[in-house]
């Protein structure tokens, strides 16, 4: 940073300062930039331009990716929007009814975007995970220790909930961006297609948490007016 300070942005909020590059000098990392083979795998990539601008890949490599011409069945997801099934099945009803369940034969997970969104679940006795407890709670589910619904705060990737550990996944409310840089872009360009692609990518990542294999399956409930509107809008449903 010291040697290339002009290539960085600085964002300041009420709680933190964030410094991030707008032009990464990827060639400074020889083990990556000079590698004979570089393979990137993602199921949810929405913006291929990052590979060229951010990772210094050639446009030809991005235009001609390796393709699996015989993909396997990747599990089954049943996507349900309760508010479209019946007007009475609103956000509060879904949260309340699932929090009433004290024992279950399978894991139930709610993904929420912030601590604020956890409050209703917490008041109704759900298990709220923290940075310290999340992996212990997920291990309990994988061991078959099912009880109340488990709430995960702003973790749309990096966690696996296979088989019985998650048969019901509640995707609650529109995801937030983590970084100040992304939040600034969202506020400055609220209708940007690139921003909408990033939001859609987070949603897709969340949807994929409960199905991790070709024989896996999960019911996914989508609640929260902003999230439902985003997924159904003519301008944004093309990303799914």
Task: For the regions a language model picked out, list residue spans one by one.
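Short active-site oxyanion
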Residues: 35-39, 104-109, 146-148
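Conserved strand-helix element at the start of the C-terminal RecA-like helicase core
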Residues: 101-123
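Conserved RecA-like P-loop NTPase helicase motor core
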Residues: 84-87, 140-230
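Short glycine-/polar-rich loops that comprise or flank the Walker A/P-loop
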Residues: 34-36, 74-77, 105-106, 163-167, ...
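Short, low-complexity, polybasic intrinsically disordered segments
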Residues: 230-240
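Short, basic/hydrophobic alpha-helical segments
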Residues: 92-103, 140
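A contiguous, basic/glycine-rich beta-loop/short-helix subdomain that forms a polymer-engagement track
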Residues: 1-92, 126-138, 152
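Short, polar loop motifs at secondary-structure junctions
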Residues: 44-46, 113-117, 153-156
């Amino acid at each position: 940073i010291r040697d290339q300070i002009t290539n960085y942005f600085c964002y300041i909020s009420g709680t933190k300062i964030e410094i991030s590059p707008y032009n990464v000098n990827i060639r400074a990392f020889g083990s990556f930039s000079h590698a004979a083979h570089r393979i990137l795998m993602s199921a949810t990539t929405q913006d291929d331009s990052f590979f060229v601008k951010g990772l210094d890949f050639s446009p030809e490599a991005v235009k001609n990716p390796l393709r699996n011409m015989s993909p396997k069945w990747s599990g089954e997801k049943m996507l349900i929007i309760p508010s479209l099934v019946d007007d009475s099945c609103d956000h509060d009803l879904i949260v309340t009814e699932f929090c009433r369940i004290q024992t279950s034969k399978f894991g139930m997970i709610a993904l929420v975007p912030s601590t604020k969104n956890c409050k209703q679940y917490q008041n109704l006795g759900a298990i709220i995970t923290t940075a310290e407890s999340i992996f212990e709670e997920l291990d309990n589910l994988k061991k078959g220790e099912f009880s109340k619904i488990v709430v995960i705060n702003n973790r749309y990737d990096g966690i696996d909930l296979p088989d019985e550990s998650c048969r019901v996944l509640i995707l609650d409310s529109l995801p937030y961006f983590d970084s100040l840089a992304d939040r600034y872009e969202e506020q400055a360009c609220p209708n940007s297609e690139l921003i909408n692609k990033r939001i859609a990518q987070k949603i897709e990542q969340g949807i994929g948490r409960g199905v991790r294999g070709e024989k896996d399956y999960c019911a996914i409930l989508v609640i929260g007016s902003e999230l439902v509107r985003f997924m159904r809008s003519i301008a944004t449903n093309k990303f799914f």
